[in-house]
Amino acid sequence: GGMKGRRKEMVRQELHQQLKTAFNVDAIHSEYGMTELLSQAYSKKNGLFKTPPWMKFIIRDFEDPYSLAKINSSGGINIIDLANIYSCSFIETQDIGKEVEKDSFEILGRFDKSEVRGCNLLSF
């Protein structure tokens, strides 16, 4: 998501607070997915994303893409989606995240100078 340079960038907590206030709701749920994949990860209220059983996330080390980051350490997000049976089932994103628990991750942002990606042209 994000503003894609069209508005002032804001952190997720700030955006979620504005949405909760505007729509008079207690929590915001989120989806993490991309065009190249058939599956998505979902976050219910707390910003921790969980994947379905056929989709796996890997947090790679910043300095060594062949090494995994430790739990609660940030790194680049890789996704394996076994639902992609006739296309590439794994991608390396330029998103930064951390594995919080064995089956959940948090998105922290994007790598500096990474290409602007996504279809979300969020506006208020």
Placement of each model-derived feature along the sequence:
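Active-site glycine/GP-rich loop and adjacent strand/helix microenvironment
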Residues: 1-124
